[in-house]
């Protein structure tokens, strides 16, 4: 594989963190929307009627959806924490500390390039150049992991 392809493998791995974080944010947004719907609706309390079929109580149905989404969010947060811990351990295999800082800032802390550049007192252009080198070093430092991952993808 070319250096560009190796770097892309590293980027694809890192993308999982951002995608999982976005999914968590979307699920939280859905919960917030459902909760606001609960407070904006008026529910009329009536004695229970016996029906052979029909819709459940909308309040109960919405609460069940919220609880289910909150369980999903908790599971995804646990998954994200594990991914970040694993990734942090893998980043330690990059020998250059500036490159480590860039990878941590971008992929674990999910910062933008300008913020990373300001924190490191580098120009954004230099950060991007170091980032390219860091991706390649990340792949090389974790080559066995990526080879197993590629093999599993090909077999699955």
Task: Please identify what each model-predicted range represents.
Residues 1-90, 136, 140-156:
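N-terminal interaction/assembly modules
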Residues 60, 79, 101, 124-126:
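Coiled-coil-like amphipathic alpha-helices with heptad-repeat character
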Residues 83-86, 97-99, 130:
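N-terminal positioning helix adjacent to the helix-turn-helix/winged-helix DNA-binding module
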Residues 91, 95-98, 126:
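Short coil/turn residues that cap or connect secondary-structure elements
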Residues 95-111:
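Short amphipathic alpha helix immediately N-terminal
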Residues 115-118:
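Short alpha-helical "recognition helix" segments of helix-turn-helix
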Residues 121-141:
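DNA-recognition helix of helix-turn-helix
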């Amino acid at each position: 594989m070319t250096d560009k392809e190796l770097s892309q493998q590293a980027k694809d791995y890192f993308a999982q963190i951002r995608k999982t974080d976005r999914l968590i944010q979307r699920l939280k947004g859905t919960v917030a929307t459902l909760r606001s719907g609960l407070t904006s609706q008026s529910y009329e309390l009536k004695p229970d009627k016996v029906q052979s079929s029909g819709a459940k109580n909308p309040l109960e149905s919405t609460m069940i959806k919220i609880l289910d989404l909150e369980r999903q969010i908790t599971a995804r947060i646990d998954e994200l924490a594990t991914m970040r811990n694993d990734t942090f351990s893998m980043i330690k295999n990059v020998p250059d500390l500036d490159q480590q800082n860039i990878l941590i800032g971008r992929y674990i802390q999910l910062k933008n390039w300008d913020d990373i550049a300001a924190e490191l007192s580098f120009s954004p252009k230099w950060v991007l150049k170091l980032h390219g080198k860091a991706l390649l070093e990340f792949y090389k430092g974790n080559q066995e992991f990526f080879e197993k991952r590629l093999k599993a993808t090909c077999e699955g």
